[in-house]
């Protein structure tokens, strides 16, 4: 599941249960308690997408699609303050899932994950400029391949 937030909303996108993937996007209002509300849908069902965002935009990238077992290369975005379906942002260089995302207010990093060959892990880091749609670009590589990573970021650093 991809997660991202603004100061007022927390958003979760995608996910799975043992039989299916989901493309649903839900949100909560940070200042109150209660159940999540439907925000919209991703462009495709996906398990294990990477999430990142800034105060304005949320990004859900990559993932894995059941039942055809395909990794996804697409990057989707939403405007956090509104509701509605995601739109296409661009593509990653490699189809991957279960990587991590991190962001500053301007740049997002899409980090590592699992690639299509069974059991292969990916050590590449790609970046996007959150305000501008387009394909991810090479940022660098991790020293080691990682899978099922986690993410964190603040106002200054991813």
Regions found by a protein language model. Name each.
Residues 37-41, 87-91, 137-141:
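A short beta-strand motif characteristic of beta-propeller blades
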Residues 46-50, 96-100, 146-147:
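Repeated scaffold domains used in trafficking and secretory/extracellular systems
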Residues 4-19, 30, 54-70, 80, ...:
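Glycine-centered tight turns/hairpins at beta-strand boundaries that repeat
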Residues 21-24, 36, 70-74, 86, ...:
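A detector of repeated loop/turn-to-beta-strand junctions in beta-rich toroidal repeat architectures
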Residues 148-156:
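Conserved small/polar residues in nucleotide/adenosyl-binding loops
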């Amino acid at each position: 599941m991809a997660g991202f937030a603004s100061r007022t909303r927390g958003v979760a996108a995608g996910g799975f249960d043992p039989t299916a993937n989901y493309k649903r996007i839900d949100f909560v209002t940070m200042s109150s308690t209660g159940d999540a509300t439907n925000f919209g849908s991703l462009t495709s069902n996906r398990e294990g997408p990477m999430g990142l965002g800034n105060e304005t935009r949320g990004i859900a990238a990559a993932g894995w699609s059941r039942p055809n077992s395909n990794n996804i290369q697409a990057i989707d975005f939403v405007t956090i303050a509104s509701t509605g379906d995601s739109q296409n942002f661009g593509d990653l260089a490699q189809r991957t899932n279960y990587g991590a995302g991190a962001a500053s207010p301007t740049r997002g990093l899409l980090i590592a994950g699992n690639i299509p060959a069974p059991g292969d892990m990916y050590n590449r880091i790609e970046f996007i400029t959150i305000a501008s749609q387009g394909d991810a670009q090479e940022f660098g590589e991790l020293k080691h391949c990682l899978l099922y990573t986690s993410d964190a970021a603040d106002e200054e650093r991813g």
